[in-house]
Amino acid sequence: MVAPVNGIASALQQMQAMAAQAAGGASPATSLAGSGAASAGSFASAMKASLDKISGDQQKALGEAHAFEIGAQNVSLNDVMVDMQKANIGFQFGLQVRNKLVSAYNEIMQMSV
């Protein structure tokens, strides 16, 4: 039972690190002094890194599934299923982030100046 808890803790730690990276990884006092372009660049790079990781996880899962289908001896069904679920969770997370960004954009566009 320790392995699933470690997996959840690891996923939570990764999400917190991504949130810190998206926030610029700086304290509020230093982020106020920074320029808007630097914040936009760090957000864009964090978003690209997240999308690349999601894509990589999906490619890895598909590769393992294909290897299992052709009968590779070093790939078990458990590994395939776990990697497929990790890829699915990552995709769902990315989809929710996208939905929140679109919602925030629409809300900003509807604000009166």
From Swiss-Prot:
NCBIfam families per record: fliE
Pfam families according to UniProt: FliE (PF02049)
Compartments, as annotated in UniProt: Bacterial flagellum basal body
GO CC, one annotated term: bacterial-type flagellum basal body
Gene Ontology terms, MF aspect: cytoskeletal motor activity; structural molecule activity
UniProt similarity note: Belongs to the FliE family.
Keywords: Bacterial flagellum
Entry's Gene Ontology BP terms: bacterial-type flagellum-dependent cell motility
Main location: other
InterPro entries assigned to the protein according to its UniProt record, in alphabetical order: FliE
Name of the molecule in the record: Flagellar hook-basal body complex protein FliE
UniProt source species: Burkholderia mallei (strain ATCC 23344)
Gene name, Swiss-Prot/TrEMBL: fliE
Domain of life: Bacteria
Keyword Transmembrane helix appears in the UniProt entry: no
Keyword Aminoacyl-tRNA synthetase among record annotations: no
HAMAP family: FliE
